[in-house]
């Protein structure tokens, strides 16, 4: 006999140990719920109830930990297998309450996870991970998946130093079949896994979950085209929440969905004939059970023929069997469809089109203009976020201000972003110049060549893309822009370490991959004022491409140019900020500030160093570098970028010039040659060895003062 909590005065009652697993679970859940109600909520306030009229679960959010009696019994997907549909619906409600409660205390990606709660429950109920592979595209929506796969107890650490990653990560869990962070990769990965399965003689299922936004990228269509040709069994779940661009795309709320795909999906959603025929097929299936396959298939075939004038959907033209649209918040429908697809002997690639709502079930997210896509800590009762006050704006906002000033002075200035208006600051530009701002969807390759076409016709395009996302369009940067010397301006946001988003979003490589191009001008500002000047510099460069990088986070409080209108800098010229002797620190980008702080620390050791701001990696200020090398014993370059970046260019020049043949000691400080995990920015810089303390210790060591260096390090 086992003792379980009860609503009786003794609070315990016996459950026979020979009770079958399903009945035993129901008794445990009911007992836990009764106990929670009796003690005022136990660890959490009872905040969920099922409404009799609609059958829907009503969640009353508060700051208290929710009572989750059913979720408490689910540690891994195996614990969900015997749950009934009503229990799965209750599990989804508890999971939604758990996510809101957890993310309210940690921050993170909220609304995308709330939108796929029922999907995650249905997938893990029907399929058997980690044998079956579920690949979440991008990964913003993976929180319910993480909770259901053994990581609930660590969710309070998500996106924090040494905590859970904000995205699926293969070395975090066997249930994370493929790492994510960037968009539109899941179908390609799923197809590779499906083909590998077939070659190895395995029988597992492979499922890709991809949003309509990710479907705007060319890679998704390349993968679907190939999957239709290879005809391997796999399932693509298209999560259609009408979010082709992130909901922060404009200042007025969600952007109008971009491209023909969104129109096609809307037609599919609104097809009355299709919906009626789907319901007819479902009714036939329920009526004649196991013999329904042939009859239902005929009805389904007819339904698919109604979708377009040509008698098929785009997906079927690519070789995928299309099912949908399906209510993505109906556990019953999702489970039924997944079970049907799972039981089909050789379906080839199947696309299940589900319709969901971002932020579903949490009223503040449903009502918010940005759907609470990415949030800091917030009050779960109201949704009000606890944003820290800062006397300065973000670098992104300073960039936007400067670009607006350039556009006011020159009507040829235009802005391009890849579904990231809010992230890149071009939502501000769009508000001022809606006809000169272009959201091309999650399509960095297209964005770059589109900008090249604009430049070829005499416009002045600024292509604003995160440093890590520009990697996706690199061949276009080389072949379509740099080779032709077209004056496209690249504003590379989120350069360097990015904190909680981790290595998938870290902008470590842009200096290396841009400065190796023969025609590219490569800049990095030391502060927000310099950023404004570099925007003006890029606007003035009209005979070749240019780029400038800037970090996540806020400015340092530098004195801004009048009216926030920058002044073009002399291309390829740096500046000396502090004069000294023996030692020179040559900083690139925001590491100039770390060099200044290191110089202050070194004064306490009687060392007065020269601090210079390189400004340009290409072309280098060779005159400044030669002067620093000739007049100092030690030269240290400092950058927040990878090996092969600014320091490499300086070392290469000094080597070719013979300036390393003498007594000069040269050291380059840069990001370590490995990926740095997510965490607080201060922790990441510490791990990378790029704090002012590390710079000062390096100088002391080079000057033959190892004990003092050791005390600092």
UniProtKB/Swiss-Prot annotation:
Its EC number is 2.2.1.7. Binds 1 Mg(2+) ion per subunit. Binds 1 thiamine pyrophosphate per subunit. It comes from the Eukaryota. PROSITE patterns: TRANSKETOLASE_1 (PS00801), TRANSKETOLASE_2 (PS00802). One of its GO terms (molecular function) is metal ion binding. Residues 1-30 form a transit peptide. It is found in: Plastid, Chloroplast. Pathway: Metabolic intermediate biosynthesis; 1-deoxy-D-xylulose 5-phosphate biosynthesis; 1-deoxy-D-xylulose 5-phosphate from D-glyceraldehyde 3-phosphate and pyruvate: step 1/1. Coiled coil: none annotated. Thiamine diphosphate binds at residues 140, 181-183, 213-214, 241, 362, 444. Catalyzes the acyloin condensation reaction between C atoms 2 and 3 of pyruvate and glyceraldehyde 3-phosphate to yield 1-deoxy-D-xylulose-5-phosphate (DXP). Is a limiting enzyme for plastidic isoprenoid biosynthesis and essential for chloroplast development. Homodimer. This is Probable 1-deoxy-D-xylulose-5-phosphate synthase 2, chloroplastic. It comes from Oryza sativa subsp. japonica (Rice).
């Amino acid at each position: 006999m086992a003792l379980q909590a009860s609503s009786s005065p003794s609070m315990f009652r016996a459950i026979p140990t020979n009770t079958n697993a399903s009945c035993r679970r129901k008794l445990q859940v009911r007992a836990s719920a009764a106990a929670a109600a009796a003690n005022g909520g136990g660890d959490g306030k009872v905040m969920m109830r099922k409404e009799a009229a609609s059958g829907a679960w009503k969640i009353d959010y508060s700051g208290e930990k929710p009572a989750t009696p059913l979720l408490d019994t689910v540690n891994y997907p195996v614990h969900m297998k015997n749950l009934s549909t009503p229990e799965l619906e209750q599990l989804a409600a508890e999971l939604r309450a758990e996510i809101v409660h957890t993310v309210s205390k940690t921050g993170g990606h909220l609304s995308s996870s709330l939108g796929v709660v029922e999907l995650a429950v249905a997938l893990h109920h029907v399929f058997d991970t980690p044998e079956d592979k579920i690949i979440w595209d991008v990964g913003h929506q993976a929180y319910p998946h993480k909770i259901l796969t053994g990581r609930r107890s660590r969710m309070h650490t998500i996106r924090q130093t040494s905590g859970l990653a904000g995205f699926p990560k293969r070395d975090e869990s066997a249930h994370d079949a493929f790492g994510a962070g960037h968009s539109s990769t899941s179908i390609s990965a799923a197809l590779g896994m499906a083909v590998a399965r077939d070659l190895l003689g395995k029988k597992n299922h492979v499922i890709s979950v991809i949003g309509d936004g990710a479907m705007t990228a060319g890679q998704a269509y390349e993968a679907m085209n190939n999957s239709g040709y290879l005809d391997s069994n796999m399932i693509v779940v298209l999560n259609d929440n009408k979010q082709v661009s992130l909901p922060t795309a404009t200042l007025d709320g969600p952007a109008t969905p971009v491209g023909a795909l969104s129109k096609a999906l809307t037609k599919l959603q609104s097809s009355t004939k299709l919906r009626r025929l789907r319901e007819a097929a479902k009714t036939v299936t329920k009526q004649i059970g196991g013999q329904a396959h042939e009859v239902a298939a005929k009805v389904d075939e007819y339904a698919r023929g109604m979708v377009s004038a040509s008698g098929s959907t785009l997906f079927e033209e690519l070789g995928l069997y299309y099912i949908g649209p399906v209510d993505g918040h109906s556990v019953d429908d999702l489970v039924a469809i997944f079970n049907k697809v799972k039981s089909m002997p050789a379906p080839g690639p199947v696309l299940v089109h589900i319709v969901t709502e971002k932020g579903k079930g949490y009223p503040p997210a449903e009502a918010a203009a940005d759907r609470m896509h990415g949030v800091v800590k917030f009050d779960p009762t109201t949704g009000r976020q606890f944003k820290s006050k800062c006397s300065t704006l973000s670098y992104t906002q300073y960039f936007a201000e400067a670009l607006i000033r350039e556009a006011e002075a020159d009507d040829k200035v235009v802005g391009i972003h890849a579904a990231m208006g809010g992230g890149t600051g071009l939502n501000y530009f769009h508000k001022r110049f809606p006809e000169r701002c272009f959201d091309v969807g999650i399509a960095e390759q297209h964005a770059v060549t589109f900008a090249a076409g604009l430049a070829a016709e005499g416009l002045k395009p600024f292509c604003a893309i995160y440093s890590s996302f520009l990697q996706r369009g690199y061949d276009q940067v080389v072949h379509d822009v740099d080779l032709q010397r077209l004056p496209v301006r690249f504003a590379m946001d989120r350069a360097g370490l990015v904190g909680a988003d981790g290595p998938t979003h870290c902008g470590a490589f842009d200096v290396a991959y841009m400065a190796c191009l023969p025609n590219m001008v490569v800049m990095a500002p030391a502060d927000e004022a310099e950023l404004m000047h570099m925007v003006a510099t890029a606007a003035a460069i009209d005979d070749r491409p240019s780029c400038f990088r800037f970090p996540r986070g806020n400015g340092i409080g530098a004195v801004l140019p009048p009216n926030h209108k920058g002044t073009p800098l002399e291309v390829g010229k740096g500046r000396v900020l502090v004069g000294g002797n023996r030692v020179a620190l040559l900083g690139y980008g925001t590491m100039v500030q770390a060099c200044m702080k290191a110089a202050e620390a070194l004064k306490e050791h009687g060392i007065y160093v020269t601090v210079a701001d390189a400004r340009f990696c290409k072309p280098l200020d060779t005159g400044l570098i030669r002067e620093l090398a000739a007049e100092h014993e030690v030269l240290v370059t400092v950058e927040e970028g990878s090996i092969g970046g600014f320091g490499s260019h300086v070392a290469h020049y000094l080597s070719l010039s013979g300036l390393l043949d003498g007594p000069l000691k040269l050291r380059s400080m840069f990001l370590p040659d490995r990926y740095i995990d997510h965490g607080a920015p201060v922790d990441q810089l510490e791990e990378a060895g790029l704090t002012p303390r590390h710079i000062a210790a390096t100088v002391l060591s080079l000057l033959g003062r190892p004990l003092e260096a050791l005390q600092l390090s």
